């Protein structure tokens, strides 16, 4: 499958290029390379605070992979917030290799989850955060979108 199969939103804002590792119930490791078509570039730079979107996309892929194991399809998830967001460099450049490792801390049956994410730029820690996400069931999403 392609990354776009795991992230049910516009491919124009898909920032992840490949899945490196997926351990069900535990973690995901994904890779991206900053390119010139990246919609988040400003003056050729990807500002580090936008790394939160890359982390969130890694969790979207993780959730979609978990749903795939249960025979379900990918759905929208929501980034509720973050804590302990630390940035160790101000920006990333075109050509930089980004690897994100996200580990499940808490995931309950309602779809609420807490994940520890680390983002590495060319092998060095570039940012990290604790992300709170909601990945509700399909019925909840249908109802929310119809209102």
Which positions does each model-derived feature cover?
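Catalytic strand-loop segment that frames the active site of acyl-thioester-processing enzymes
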Residues: 11-47
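Hydrophobic beta-strand-centered segment that forms part of the acyl-chain substrate-binding groove
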Residues: 61-101
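HotDog/MaoC-like acyl-thioester-processing domains
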Residues: 61, 93-99, 103-147
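Conserved positions in beta-strands of structured domains
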Residues: 17-20, 88, 103-105
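Compact, glycine-rich, soluble single-domain proteins
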Residues: 43-62, 76-77
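Small-residue-enriched segments and motifs
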Residues: 14-17, 80, 100-102, 129
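Short aromatic-glycine motifs in intrinsically disordered, low-complexity regions
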Residues: 1-10
């Amino acid at each position: 499958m392609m990354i776009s199969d795991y992230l049910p939103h516009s491919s124009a804002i898909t920032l992840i290029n490949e899945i490196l590792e997926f351990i069900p119930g535990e973690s995901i490791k994904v890779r991206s390379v900053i390119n010139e078509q990246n919609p988040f570039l400003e003056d050729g730079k990807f500002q580090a605070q936008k790394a939160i979107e890359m982390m969130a996309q890694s969790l979207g892929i993780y959730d979609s992979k978990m749903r795939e194991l249960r025979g379900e399809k990918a759905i929208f998830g929501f980034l509720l917030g973050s804590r302990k967001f630390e940035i160790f460099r101000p920006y990333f450049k075109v050509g930089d290799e980004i690897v994100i490792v996200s580990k499940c801390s808490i995931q309950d049956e309602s779809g609420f989850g807490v994940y520890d994410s680390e983002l590495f730029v060319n092998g060095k820690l570039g940012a990290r955060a604790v992300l709170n996400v909601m990945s509700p069931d399909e019925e909840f999403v249908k109802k929310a979108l119809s209102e």
